[in-house]
UniProtKB/Swiss-Prot annotation:
Mitochondrion found in the keyword field: yes
Highest taxon, organism lineage: Eukaryota
Subcellular localization, as worded in the UniProt entry: Mitochondrion
Broad class of where this protein is predominantly found: mitochondrion
Organism: Schizosaccharomyces pombe (strain 972 / ATCC 24843) (Fission yeast)
Keywords from the UniProt entry: Mitochondrion
Name of the protein described by the UniProt record: Uncharacterized protein SPAP27G11.14c
Entry keyword annotation includes Mitochondrion: yes
A GO CC term attached to the entry: mitochondrion
Length: 689
């Protein structure tokens, strides 16, 4: 789903708790998608960075304050990012959580309340050793917060001030320039010892460690977010359909197929233990105002509110359940998560937002590809559950009843979700083409591999055909604001419309399917259901991601981090860089920057003619000015280095390279890089890169 992040970022710009504004997708850990991933390790690290005044590099701090709205990087000292990258990422995540909590509280919150939140997430025995948050804010975050003895006031509501990249460089500077002594409440300890212990802990822990060392209520809450979010989105869909009916049936969650959203046994058990959907909503205090809450889904904080309200719901539930029963419930959830999700890798990315994954923050572009093969195999992974319920419904109900009950609505939802991927595929193609595309060409696009990241299974194609084909779908009144569609061709109404995201597309397509199915006979509906289910079942186990993944898009992603690293380094040194020095930087000095570069990335740069050949291309002329000897960086913004900006440009660049190399040489290069990257991802020493 990270490949869709540039399509989703505008609808849910929750940038502070989470990751860089360009890449906002909701976190899905293998076990838990907790909204604020803060563990005991975070606090141990914060303890290690709260040191005497001499610990902070004053030159860097003052420079940062002056240039906080300028380019990505201020003048920073040489930093060994590789050594502290995981530690830094955890601190960044923690700072962003504080910032967003203050935003949620109208930029003002009590210091005691803030301290309480932190204390509630970790054991008291560990928290006892920490220096207070108040001290940390007063020393290092004076440009973001004003902290008195009673209040924490947010001075700036500009999310870019606490963006992941800016905070990362800032905190890394503090870590790298810390004194030898670190002040605890009651003791002093060597800084290097603290760093070493925490680094080993972060590097060696697994998700089970993270889960069991987080607040039980916090972990429990993370399992409630997806079902509740799905339920709210269904209410929106009901509203748009004119029904405005609130349903609390738990079966709606167990059969949910809302645009790629999957529910594991952990999700379903959490709903069961909270007392069902009705009980969860009732405890959240939303029973009367639920529809009003749902209508504000476009609020930036929509999912954050769901999580925080669900968290209070979990705490309230805990109060009315005996302690031994509560512990048994949590243990059951842990066991389910460990057995079902870990071994089978069934937990999937949710719909819109991504929190910072501590040990993967600075290598988002590379690491995200590792997650996709398991999470992107099919639109609906809990397929057996769906098929069994479908068969039971068919046996028990007549044709008329089958299409009047809630299960029919569930299938329409699935059908709409199958149309989302082809629509995104078409949008990516039209964005690259930047012109009207002949309808026949658009249809052929689905039948062959092209430079887009959205691989289409046969059931996607049959879903398009079942709904009348591309012209019928794109020219419908529900999508008229997105596409201009005639009998001759298809074009986008706007190249960078905020409406081109998965969530909005799903709503439009849901309306279209709901309207379209009214014109079908019961026999036609059953035929469509059986056809799509058959192809889904046949392809479920065989959809290997790397076999169909576009080589252009894959290699483009390998090139992103070298380009970002080069831009970061030239801006950092503040001068024109010799071309030979830049080439060496990629090979020997890339560990000095916040972007991890894999050997496969270096190989891609080398095989495509080196840095000069790549960055002198017109597609990157807005960032670099490159002669035969020197490279300098033009003035650029963070958006210029985002995936949504770089990927289409690099795809166009690679299409040019393919034409000059020839199909045979290109296929050989693509296969070499894919095999190389696959070996890297399977290697236990991946972190060494």
């Amino acid at each position: 789903m990270n490949l869709l992040s540039h399509q989703l970022r505008d609808r849910f710009p929750i940038k502070a708790i989470i990751s860089k504004a360009d890449e906002v997708i909701f976190a899905n850990y293998k076990h838990t998608n907790d909204f604020f991933k803060i563990t005991a390790t975070t606090y141990a690290l914060i303890n290690s960075v709260i040191v005497s005044n001499n610990c902070c590099n004053r030159r860097f701090h003052s420079t940062w304050q002056k240039k906080k709205h300028d380019d990505l990087t201020a003048t920073v000292p040489v930093i060994d990012f590789r050594k502290n990258q995981k530690l830094t990422s955890i601190v960044v995540n923690a700072i962003q959580a504080i910032y967003w909590y203050a935003r949620r509280s109208n930029c003002l919150t009590g210091i005691n309340e803030a301290e309480y939140i932190w204390k509630s997430l970790i054991p008291e025995s560990i928290f006892y050793h920490f220096v207070s948050l108040q001290s940390f804010i007063r020393k290092y975050l004076t440009d973001v917060f004003y902290c008195s003895a009673q209040k924490v006031i947010l001075l700036s509501t500009d999310d870019s001030v606490v963006s992941s990249e800016k905070l990362y460089i800032r905190i890394a500077s503090i870590l790298s320039n810390a004194n030898d002594k670190v002040s605890f409440k009651e003791s002093s300890i060597n800084t290097n010892t603290v760093f070493k212990d925490v680094y080993v802990e972060v590097s060696s822990h697994n998700d089970e460690f993270l889960l069991k060392n987080s607040s039980k209520c916090w972990a429990f809450t993370s399992l409630l977010v997806d079902p509740l979010h799905f339920m709210f989105s269904q209410i929106v869909f009901e509203d748009l359909s004119g029904k405005k009916i609130m349903k609390f049936e738990d079966t709606a969650v167990s059969t949910a197929s809302n645009h790629s959203k999957q529910f594991t046994k952990g999700n379903l058990l959490a709903i069961k233990y909270i007392g069902g959907l009705y009980n969860a909503v009732y405890l959240m205090g939303l029973k009367k105002n639920l529809l009003a809450f749902v209508e504000n889904e476009k609020d930036d904080l929509f999912v954050a509110k769901i999580f925080l309200l669900a968290y209070s719901s979990s705490k309230n539930r805990k109060k009315i359940v005996p302690v031994d029963v509560w512990d048994a419930m949590i243990d059951s959830l842990y066991e389910t998560i460990n057995v079902e999700e870990t071994k089978k890798e069934t937990y999937k990315f949710t719909r819109s937002i991504k929190t910072v994954i501590p040990n993967k923050l600075i290598s988002n572009e590379s690491i995200s590809i590792l997650s996709i093969p398991e999470s992107e195999k099919t639109i609906y992974q809990n397929f057996d559950l769906y098929v069994s319920k479908f068969n039971v419904a068919r046996k028990e109900l007549s044709e008329k009843e089958l299409f009047n009950n809630s299960f029919s609505s569930s299938f329409n939802t699935l059908l709409a979700s199958l149309l989302v991927k082809p629509t995104l595929c078409l949008i990516s193609y039209l964005m690259i083409a930047k012109k009207m595309v002949v309808l026949q060409e658009a249809n052929r696009l689905f039948l062959k591999s092209f430079a887009h990241p959205f691989h289409l299974e046969r059931y996607h194609l049959h879903a398009v055909a079942a709904m009348g084909g591309l012209y019928q779908i794109m020219s419908s009144t529900h999508l008229k604001n997105l596409f201009f569609c005639s009998r001759k061709g298809i074009a986008l109404t706007k190249l960078h419309s905020q409406q081109y995201n998965e969530s909005t597309l799903f709503q439009y397509l849901s309306e279209f399917v709901h309207q379209r199915q009214k014109s079908l006979t019961p026999k036609q509906r059953i035929a469509i259901q059986e056809l799509i289910l058959k192809f889904m079942q046949r392809n479920f186990e065989n959809s290997l991601y790397h076999q169909s993944f576009s080589s252009h898009w894959f290699i483009s992603r390998l090139l992103i981090n070298p380009i970002r690293m080069l831009c970061w380094h030239i801006t950092d040194v503040g001068k024109t860089l010799d071309l030979g020095e830049a080439e060496k930087l990629l090979k020997y000095n890339h560990k000095q920057c916040p972007y991890i570069i894999y050997p496969s990335s270096l190989k891609a740069v080398q095989k495509l003619g080196g840095l000069q050949c790549i960055i002198r291309n017109d597609n990157l002329s807005h960032i670099f000015n490159c002669s035969r000897k020197y490279i300098r960086v033009q003035r650029y913004s963070d958006d210029d280095l985002s995936e949504s900006s770089l990927l289409p440009r690099l795809v166009n660049l690679l299409l040019f390279f393919e034409n000059s190399m020839g199909e045979v040489a290109w296929n050989k290069l693509s296969q070499t890089l894919m095999d190389m990257f696959e070996k890297e991802t399977k290697s236990n020493s991946l972190s060494d890169y």
